């Protein structure tokens, strides 16, 4: 047996391949560093994300908010969890893209599906803007009906009480929140 490969010494071929690989890796690192440190890098990334959101980058994977979503099997906790997380993610993405109404529908779906809806609403009250949170609260009454239609009779067996909301703002709470507070006081 010979120590040649295509007429070259095997050790020289291995050495040349190693040097070529290291040179290519250095080339990649250099240009990635140059790209990231460009002064307009972050602006380009933001513009690209806005363009994707505006041109339908999300629309291909987003179900319509009008209640035509594919309903998961309510007896499968993993499907329900996946649906809940999807609703939260879609709601946040839509609101970040400026579509507050459709985002509020998805977040309201998530709130109604959550076992700890009061805590989730409290979190959203702290993380969303006042306008966005108000839109979510306005969607809650119709969300119960929409989910009942989506899931059938099993949705009626779920939590029948509206979520409690703790208003942390100055002055009296908005009318929608006051209605929810008044509804829960009837249970005592």
From Swiss-Prot:
Q: Where is the composition biased (Low complexity)?
A: 58-67
| Gene Ontology MF term list | mitochondrion targeting sequence binding
* Localization of this protein: Mitochondrion outer membrane
Query: Matching InterPro entries, A to Z?
Result: MAS20, MAS20_rcpt_metazoan, Tom20_dom_sf
Topology check: give the Cytoplasmic ranges.
32-188
Q: Where are the transmembrane segments?
A: 13-31
Q: Which residues lie on this side of the membrane: Mitochondrial intermembrane?
A: 1-12
What is a biological process (GO) this protein takes part in? intracellular protein transport
Spans annotated as Disordered: 48-67, 155-188
Membrane topology value:
Single-pass membrane protein
What coarse category fits the chief subcellular location reported for this protein?
mitochondrion
Q: Name one GO cellular component term.
A: mitochondrial outer membrane translocase complex
Task: Write out the entry's keywords from A to Z.
Answer: Membrane, Mitochondrion, Mitochondrion outer membrane, Protein transport, Transmembrane, Transmembrane helix, Transport
Question: What does the function comment of this entry state?
Answer: Central component of the receptor complex responsible for the recognition and translocation of cytosolically synthesized mitochondrial preproteins. Together with TOM22 functions as the transit peptide receptor at the surface of the mitochondrion outer membrane and facilitates the movement of preproteins into the translocation pore.
Q: What protein family does this chain belong to? A: Belongs to the Tom20 family.
Q: How does it assemble?
A: Forms part of the preprotein translocase complex of the outer mitochondrial membrane (TOM complex).
Q: Which PANTHER family match?
A: MITOCHONDRIAL IMPORT RECEPTOR SUBUNIT TOM20, TRANSLOCASE OF OUTER MITOCHONDRIAL MEMBRANE 20
Q: What is this protein called?
A: Mitochondrial import receptor subunit TOM20 homolog
Instruction: Write down the species.
Output: Caenorhabditis briggsae
What is the organism lineage in this UniProt record?
Eukaryota, Metazoa, Ecdysozoa, Nematoda, Chromadorea
